[in-house]
């Protein structure tokens, strides 16, 4: 059976250090273990790395170690993904101010991944955004993409899965 391919955005990786939300830390850690043990294929992008490099030094080093130990593959951004991200912004799916969110989604789409995993409920894990993203994808000849929360992958919700 084909392994699911997950693009994990920076909000999830940052959740590892959320001192105010232990449940979030546990979910993020569990997701990284599931990627590390080969249950899922995990992907990040150069954009993710750029965002990590903007984090405070102590967190930056810990994040880099977590990513390395979890076995993420790194995807490149290219003209095709930039064009698709522009289309998301132009369609009103993602505000111009948050273009990086559109870039993350576009990278996952052009690399034909199965899911984008994020805790960004305002600009990504949101039914209205998903509809606009997927209508843009279909209009431009791409597959639709599921944008989900980490809990949907790990089963760490309120209900036992």
Explain the meaning of each model-derived region.
Residues 1-2, 19, 25, 111-161:
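Acidic, PIN/NYN-like endoribonuclease modules and their adjacent C-terminal/linker elements
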Residues 29, 46, 102-106:
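Non-catalytic, well-ordered alpha-helical scaffold segments
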């Amino acid at each position: 059976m084909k392994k699911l391919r997950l693009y994990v955005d920076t909000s999830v990786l940052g959740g590892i250090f959320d001192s105010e939300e232990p449940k979030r830390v546990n979910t993020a850690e569990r997701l990284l273990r599931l990627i590390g043990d080969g249950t899922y294929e995990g992907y990040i992008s150069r954009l993710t790395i750029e965002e990590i490099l903007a984090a405070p030094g102590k967190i930056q080093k810990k994040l880099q170690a977590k990513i390395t130990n979890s076995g993420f593959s790194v995807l490149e951004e290219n003209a095709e993904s930039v064009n698709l991200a522009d289309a998301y912004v132009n369609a009103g799916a993602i505000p111009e101010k948050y273009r990086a969110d559109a870039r993350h989604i576009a990278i996952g789409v052009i690399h034909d991944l199965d899911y984008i995993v994020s805790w960004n409920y305002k600009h990504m894990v949101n039914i209205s955004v998903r509809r606009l993203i997927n209508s843009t994808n279909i209009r431009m000849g791409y597959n639709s993409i599921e944008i989900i929360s980490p809990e949907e992958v790990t089963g760490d919700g309120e209900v036992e899965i």
